[in-house]
């Protein structure tokens, strides 16, 4: 099996190395950002050149985003030898609920799916110090299932693993998390103000049965959530059929 690995924590991250070890015996290629890129979402570099450095055999660093890394991995490094699966992680911390909208880990996997390759994003929902081995092994086992039982269209599976041995897993839906939404103001030695987004506010996880948040944080199960690349809000789409915009003609739906 040929595997393309990436992440958002950087090419030298411990979680990425654990993932590579979990695919021992497979043909593993790594194309990852050259530095930490957490919460970079699906940003792609269109207005500056990118550099690609082979830091070890089949192990590449890109001076760009996680999306840049997977894009270059599929369209340059492995252009003539498509991988069977793209796996992103192991992320240092969870990507649950609305985290997926900000996550560079999830975005790297999503880029793989957008480019036609089944993909898995994996995160360890634990504070440091991190032991990534169990999360990496679970992700590798799941990735092999994806390759053995390929879906009709490219799939993206978002995996979150609690600390310790995986005693079980559940297929889940995305939960909902409420962030502190703080902006912390500081002053530098020259008297100028600067700001940190987020601060140290607590994150509230809504108690939603069947959600990834409940499975991982309350029941200590690994959560596997299939993410749909079509972001259309279907109930609102149906509602809009009854709307009119004054002064403009509405064309009938095809």
Curated annotation (Swiss-Prot):
Family listed: Belongs to the SurE nucleotidase family.
Gene3D superfamilies listed in its UniProt record: Survival protein SurE-like phosphatase/nucleotidase
EC nos: 3.1.3.5
Enzyme class: hydrolase
Annotated protein name in UniProt: 5'-nucleotidase SurE
Catalyzed reactions per annotation: a ribonucleoside 5'-phosphate + H2O = a ribonucleoside + phosphate
Compartments (UniProt record): Cytoplasm
Residues annotated as binding a divalent metal cation: 8-9, 38, 91
Function in brief: Nucleotidase that shows phosphatase activity on nucleoside 5'-monophosphates.
Principal cellular location given in the protein's record: cytoplasm
Entry-linked InterPro entries: SurE (IPR030048), SurE-like_Pase/nucleotidase (IPR002828), SurE-like_sf (IPR036523)
Record flagged with keyword Nucleotide-binding: yes
Designated gene of the protein: surE
NCBIfam families according to UniProt: PRK00346.1-4, surE
Pfam families with a match to the protein in the record: SurE
Superkingdom, natural source: Bacteria
Keywords, in A-Z order: Cytoplasm, Hydrolase, Metal-binding, Nucleotide-binding
Recorded GO MF terms: 3'-nucleotidase activity; 5'-nucleotidase activity; exopolyphosphatase activity; metal ion binding; nucleotide binding
Membrane-traversing stretches: none
Cofactor: record remark: Binds 1 divalent metal cation per subunit.
GO cellular component, as recorded: cytoplasm
Cofactor or coenzyme needed: a divalent metal cation
């Amino acid at each position: 099996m040929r595997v393309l690995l990436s992440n958002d924590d950087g090419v030298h991250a411990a979680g990425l190395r654990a993932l590579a070890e979990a695919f021992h015996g497979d043909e593993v290629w790594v194309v990852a950002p050259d530095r930490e890129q957490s919460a970079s979402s699906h940003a792609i570099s269109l207005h500056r050149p990118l550099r690609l450095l082979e830091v070890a055999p089949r192990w590449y660093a890109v001076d760009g985003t996680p999306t840049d890394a997977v894009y270059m991995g599929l369209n340059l490094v492995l252009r003539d030898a498509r991988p069977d699966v793209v796996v992103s992680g192991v992320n240092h911390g969870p990507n649950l609920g609305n985290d997926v909208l900000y996550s560079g880990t999830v975005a790297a996997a999503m880029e793989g799916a957008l480019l036609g390759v089944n993909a898995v994003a994996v995160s360890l929902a634990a504070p440091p110090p991190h032991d990534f081995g169990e999360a990496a092994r679970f992700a590798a086992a799941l990735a092999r299932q994806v390759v053995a039982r390929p879906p009709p269209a490219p799939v993206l599976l978002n995996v979150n693993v609690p600390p310790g041995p995986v005693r079980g897993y559940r297929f889940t839906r995305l939960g909902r998390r409420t962030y502190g939404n703080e902006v912390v103001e500081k002053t530098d030695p020259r008297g100028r103000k600067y700001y940190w987004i987020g601060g140290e506010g607590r994150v509230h996880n809504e108690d939603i049965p069947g959600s990834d948040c409940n499975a991982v944080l309350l029941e200590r199960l690994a959560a596997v959530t299939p993410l749909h690349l079509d972001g259309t809000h279907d109930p609102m789409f149906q509602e809009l059929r009854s709307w009119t915009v004054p002064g403009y003609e509405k064309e009938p739906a095809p």
